[in-house]
Amino acid sequence: MAAKQVIFGDDARAKIVNGVNILANAVKVTLGPKGRNVVLERSFGSPTVTKDGVSVAKEIELSDKLENMGAQLVKEVASKTNDNAGDGTTTATVLAQAIVREGFKYVAAGFNPTDLKRGIDKAVAEIVNEIKAIAKPTTTSKEIAQVGSISANSDADIGQIIADAMDKVGKEGVITVEDGSGLQNELDVVEGMQFDRGYLSPYFINNPERQIALLENPFVLLYDKKISNIRDLLPTLEQVAKAGRPLLIIAEDVEGEALATLVVNNIRGILKAVAVKAPGFGDRRKAMLEDIAILTGGTVIAEEVGLSLEKVTLENLGQAKRVEIGKENTTIIDGAGSENNIKVRIDQIKKQIEDATSDYDREKLQERVAKLAGGVAVIKVGAATETEMKEKKARVEDALHATRAAVEEGIVPGGGVALLRARSSIKELKGDNPDQDAGIKIVLRAIEEPLRQIVANAGDEPSVVVNKVLEGTGNYGYNASNGTYGDLVELGVLDPAKVTRSALQNAASVASLILTTDALVAELPKEEAAPAMPDAGGMGGMGF
């Protein structure tokens, strides 16, 4: 085991504060509408230009192992806030730096770090409750657009396109972000439920222009095994043919004689039927078939529920207004399932999302919710160069997370004002002893810091602006994009309550740990061995 260096007390604190400051100073220049860019080196290709706090934080690794510990702890603040709320990473970093800075002043003056931590925790809990109390729900598309714009560094186009996407697919719908091919941002919306399986034979195509099979008002047969024998299918086909409607068959596979018969019937116009493979694999396939059954008001034909293909009646089949089947995708539009059953299914999947342990499972479950809820929107980000595309795409993703957070827990006035207004809830707060009171004072000062940094980045005097904002009440604050004061909610300067709350909680959590640290242990730097002397051989011809 390599030898370690151990340092204590003031020396340890000085090192950790240096690390915190290096990382926080690099991140905080990006805060606010007039925040600056940070350029990140890449091992290959062009450098990345970003205004995203967590992207900057993730790149920082310091050569001094002791200072690096401080930097990594603050990096954790940004990452955790990003995971919880999807935005607010720079605010969280600024708050953590302020709590560490103010806290160490008290530690140096002889206050007990553990009691300081308890005071900080007490104050933060009160402020979080106050933020929840002043938050108001997002009701209009305009508010969603404003939240998105602020998060995307005051880019109104991005805010608007996200609001449009949410209008189209609903607040539960899936919105994905992809690289566009032009200079402008574009929005593509897929209505209904789409899954990534297409027709099993090109002979099913009945719309040559779009190269799709289009079924109007079809029945939907859902089967969890392979179909290869046409005899199994005949009872169903006869009933559907009598009803004079088309049929969509979704099964593990349709092959051989069964597929050939369907194709021949389709070409001859006897029965319009299209076969596709069921989406997913294993247990996920069963779950998705069940989703489609609930959406279309049908039943999955499976031995487990005592149903076989020969015994299928029209009551067992699902129905939809329209189905479009392409080479790679199938879209079911306006299924005949009951609203109540769909809602119950969505709630059930949401419960599974809460219990999911892996990001992959969570993502797949969220996709299923969106497909049941009614659609998927794709935002295609346009830009002139690849570097600009990456930067813009990161901002769109941030804005998307922020708008989701706003829908979840509501909105508060932005520009650091919500935290300032929440001060009133802890002004009279008392701890169990003077050291805890000092912890409360640390938070009182630290929550001014986001506004101070926004103002500093905009080139104004922080103390003057903070005092002027404190003279006002309610939503009165400073709009850094044009240097004016007014009602920030009316001006459209909004933050999601969840982002503000998460930023403070995560900052206080890590900063408190740093304050109560009194020793650092790290590997000693390896001493570089002196380079070997070059070989002196082959020096003949010297005349000795």
Curated annotation (Swiss-Prot):
Principal subcellular localisation of the protein: cytoplasm
Positions with a binding annotation for ATP: 30-33, 51, 87-91, 415, 495
Keywords: ATP-binding, Chaperone, Cytoplasm, Isomerase, Nucleotide-binding
Single GO term (MF): ATP-dependent protein folding chaperone
Enzyme Commission designation: 5.6.1.7
Taxonomy, superkingdom: Bacteria
Transmembrane region(s): none
Subunit text: Forms a cylinder of 14 subunits composed of two heptameric rings stacked back-to-back. Interacts with the co-chaperonin GroES.
Name of the protein in its database record: Chaperonin GroEL
Gene name of this polypeptide: groEL
